[in-house]
């Protein structure tokens, strides 16, 4: 449904921006068959290939992180604050990045996989556009836990698909809420492969094009999301039957969650920046989100299983 909207808008159509979801064939309530050709490879697989080549265990960075955290945090009688905790995590992230995991793993893999420099250039451009689509959905739909194993890249056409694309609810109530400190995954290896020009240029403009295309009509996005959000809220209620009678009516919860999603999509369109007569860039809201997603202080707050160094 959303792709039909993108096809009708000139800014998204000329960039080739689409949301890619693998075709699923339901076998049972717990089992689905997904389309997945041999050209796809996950970031986790790329990482494990690198670890095998350099002779380190795939869990060594996580083990080193946990052991250093435990030995430093538990040692001594000094009462540490949240600032000390954040500084320690930043030091650990820098140590793992410098000594164990380079930010060039994805770039080197893609360079070796392409047959010519022109193919690599096309792959980088297509990868940037596809990551813009996945990052956009991650942010507006409150999708969390974007582990490397859930990001799959096609080596033949640059298509990027995400598995487990499910909104995250607050534990206390059926309201969308992502616990991740970063709005989407823009880890060091993704940053290096896209490059600074691609991030500030193609990636940022794609965010704005997607947000503008989906929020240009009066109630278009709300109508598309209502059924989807309704199913998610009903699923939350089915798992909390003993508490559901004390909560608000489902119709109100659906409206609230839809409004939150639309609010984030409008933020990505940067319409507020266009209306103001200020000296700040029009896409300042998008640049702020990119900064939050790529800043080491935010990445360091992620769980080590999220692999903020990859």
List the predicted regions and their residue ranges.
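ATP-dependent kinase catalytic cores of phosphoinositide-metabolizing enzymes
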Residues: 1-133, 153-310
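Short, solvent-exposed loop/edge-beta patches enriched in aromatic
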Residues: 11, 143-145
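Extended amphipathic alpha-helical scaffold segments
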Residues: 138-142
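Catalytic-loop signature of eukaryotic-like protein kinases
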Residues: 145, 149-152
């Amino acid at each position: 449904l959303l792709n039909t909207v993108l096809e009708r808008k000139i800014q998204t159509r000329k960039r080739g921006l689409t949301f890619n979801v693998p075709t699923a064939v339901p076998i049972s309530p717990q089992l689905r068959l997904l389309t997945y050709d041999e050209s796809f490879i996950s970031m986790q697989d790329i990482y494990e290939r690198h670890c095998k080549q350099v002779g380190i265990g795939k869990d060594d960075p996580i083990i080193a992180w946990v052991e250093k955290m435990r030995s430093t945090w538990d040692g001594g009688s000094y009462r540490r604050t949240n600032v000390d905790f954040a500084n320690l995590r930043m030091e650990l992230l820098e140590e793992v990045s410098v000594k164990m995991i380079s930010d060039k793993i994805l770039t080197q893999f893609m360079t070796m996989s392409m047959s010519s420099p022109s193919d690599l250039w096309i792959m980088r451009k297509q990868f940037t556009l596809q990551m813009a689509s996945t990052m956009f959905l991650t942010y507006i739909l409150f999708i969390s836990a974007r582990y490397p194993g859930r990001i799959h890249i096609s080596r033949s056409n640059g298509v990027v698909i995400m598995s487990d694309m499910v909104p995250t609810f607050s534990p206390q109530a059926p309201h969308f809420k992502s616990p991740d400190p970063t709005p989407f995954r823009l880890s060091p290896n993704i940053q290096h492969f896209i490059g600074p020009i691609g991030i500030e240029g193609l990636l940022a403009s794609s965010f704005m094009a997607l947000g503008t295309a989906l929020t240009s009509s009066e109630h278009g996005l709300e109508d598309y999301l209502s059924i989807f959000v309704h199913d998610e809220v009903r699923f939350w209620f089915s798992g909390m039957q003993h508490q559901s009678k004390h909560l608000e009516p489902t119709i109100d919860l659906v409206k609230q969650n839809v409004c939150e999603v639309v609010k984030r999509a409008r933020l990505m369109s940067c319409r507020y920046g266009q209306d103001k007569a200020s000296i700040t860039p029009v896409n300042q809201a998008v640049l702020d989100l990119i900064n939050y997603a790529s800043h080491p202080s935010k990445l360091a707050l992620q769980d080590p299983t999220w692999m903020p160094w990859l």
